[in-house]
From Swiss-Prot:
Similarity section: Belongs to the vasopressin/oxytocin family.
Organism domain of life: Eukaryota
Expression (tissue specificity): Expressed by the venom duct.
Keyword line: Disulfide bond, G-protein coupled receptor impairing toxin, Secreted, Toxin
Disulphide connectivity of cysteines: C6-C46, C9-C20, C14-C36, C21-C26, C53-C71, C65-C83, C72-C77
Protein function: Targets vasopressin-oxytocin related receptors. No effect observed when injected into goldfish or into mice.
Protein species of origin: Conus radiatus
Protein localization: Secreted
Chief localization: secreted
Name of this chain's protein: Conophysin-R
GO terms assigned for molecular function: neurohypophyseal hormone activity; toxin activity
Keyword match Secreted: yes
Amino acid sequence: HPTKPCMYCSFGQCVGPHICCGPTGCEMGTAEANMCSEEDEDPIPCQVFGSDCALNNPDNIHGHCVADGICCVDDTCTTHLGCL
């Protein structure tokens, strides 16, 4: 399946419909982060940059390291030692 990079947001990349992450951390639910929901209108799935990490999240455990010490899936983020 073809993929493309996820949209950019003010200080990094869109990680989910309401999450924007960059080197300094993540914003969730802000006006800037909510712009990431535009990604849902594109039928081609996007690929988040960052090494793989696992979240203890029942619906989606396959996350990406999107900032120092932060692992995200499309709807939540958590601190993660594997991302340091």
